[in-house]
Curated annotation (Swiss-Prot):
PANTHER family in alphabetical order: 8-AMINO-7-OXONONANOATE SYNTHASE, CLASS II AMINOTRANSFERASE/8-AMINO-7-OXONONANOATE SYNTHASE
Name assigned to this protein: 8-amino-7-oxononanoate synthase
Gene Ontology annotations of biological process type: biotin biosynthetic process
Summary of the function given for this chain in its UniProt record: Catalyzes the decarboxylative condensation of pimeloyl-[acyl-carrier protein] and L-alanine to produce 8-amino-7-oxononanoate (AON), [acyl-carrier protein], and carbon dioxide.
Quaternary structure (record): Homodimer.
Pathway: Cofactor biosynthesis; biotin biosynthesis
């Protein structure tokens, strides 16, 4: 098969499965509204859970940082790209989350890839929740370790894998909040099984940090768990981008020596680190935002209970409505868009076959009447 035939076949398969992805150009898509051209939509697809991408203090911190440090870092942190705002942010994150060290990465994808590939060897094994994020599963697949997956949120399934012999080390991988279902992992049971087997636990809490736990410390704090490796991202509740890995001192030093995604990537702009410090302060003091978000979640779930679609068992800002059929899911999303509501249709391979859904995400930036409007239109198009 030629290169062109391979490309054509792949595109044809996505079209035939009603799974073809397209990007939409917009003029702003965070917080409450999404603007595209002259059309404005209520935005129920953003991960900006607390609306901090539009926060005046966060924006001002970025502007002031850019005036002081410029708009780029100029290189890898191992060369000239590690500045005072980076060091300050790392220390603030470590103090807040109760770890000796934090290391900044340009994205959560890069952080997960770096940790899994740098820490594991051929005689090690990675035991990952079956529905872990693509960045985790891809990194585990490409790592030298053996990958085995346990049934989603099933500690007993994990235990069966832990019972099997391994000549090297075991790293168990899961998420605090899963991005497509919005459900939470039973972290205490998972950590108990992992520790009893002498393994380490990595938790990716991209969707829990900032919105769950005391002062927004996330899923691990909420469940009383402290994994050996905690990955947090800044593209959700923080309203920006980037990520960090929280760990012990020797692990941080090891990653600085061996994590290629860290060593060979240009560091985030110092101005971004300044903005992240401002976002962190707002999150630490943000019980009002978390309470407001929880009110919107409760309001939506109460109103959506009567819909003919299955509502996912989620207590978080991610509220999936399961449809099943790809074409029907796309059609529903288009009807919502025609009514001024931006809701994303999620289809395989992002979710398992037959798992197509409307992935609704809520934000503290939403007003109560926004939720009422969403429910009104959903009831209209689903009945």
């Amino acid at each position: 098969m030629s290169w062109q035939n391979k490309i054509d076949l792949g595109l044809q398969q996505r079209h035939e499965a009603a799974a073809y992805r397209c990007r939409q150009v917009n003029d702003g898509a965070n917080g409450r509204w999404l603007q595209t051209g002259a059309q404005q939509y209520l935005n129920f697809s953003s991960n900006d859970y607390l609306g901090l991408s539009q926060d005046a203090a966060v924006i001002a911190a970025w502007q002031q940082g850019a005036q002081r440090y410029g708009v780029g870092s100029g290189g890898s942190g191992h060369v000239t790209g590690y500045s005072l705002p980076h060091a300050q942010l790392e220390q603030q994150l470590a103090d807040w989350l109760g770890y000796p060290r934090a290391l900044l990465f340009i994205s959560g994808f890069a952080a997960n890839q770096a940790v899994l590939t740098a820490l594991t060897a051929a005689d090690d094994r990675i035991l990952a929740d079956k529905l872990s994020h693509a960045s985790l599963l891809e990194a585990a697949t490409h790592s030298p370790a053996q990958l085995r997956r346990f049934a989603h949120n099933q500690p007993d399934s994990l235990q069966k894998l832990l019972n099997k012999p391994c000549s090297g080390q075991t790293l168990v991988v899961t998420e605090g909040v899963f991005s497509m279902d919005g459900d939470s992992a039973p972290l205490a049971a998972i950590q108990q099984h992992t520790a009893a087997a002498g393994g380490w636990l990595l938790v990716d809490d991209a969707h829990g940090l900032g919105v769950r736990g005391a002062a927004g410390r996330g899923s691990c704090e909420l469940q009383g768990v402290k994994p050996e490796l905690l990955v947090v991202t800044f593209s959700k509740a923080f309203g920006l981008s980037g990520a960090a890995v929280l760990c012990q001192e020797p692990v941080a030093e090891y990653l600085l020596q061996y994590a290629r995604h860290l060593i060979y990537s240009t560091a985030m702009p110092p101005a971004q680190a300044c903005a992240l410090q401002a976002a962190l302060l707002r999150i630490q003091q943000g019980d009002d935002l978390r309470q407001r978000l929880q009110q919107r979640i409760t309001q939506f779930r109460c109103g959506a209970a009567a819909l003919p679609l299955q509502l996912g068992a989620s207590e978080t800002a991610i509220q999936p409505l399961l449809v099943g059929d790809n074409q029907q899911t796309v059609a529903l999303a288009e009807q919502l868009r025609a009514a001024g509501l931006w809701v994303t249709a999620i289809r395989p391979p992002t979710v398992p076959p037959g798992g197509a859904r409307l992935r609704i995400t809520l934000s503290a930036a939403h007003e109560s009447e926004d939720i009422d409007r969403l429910l009104e239109v959903l009831h209209g198009v689903c009945h």
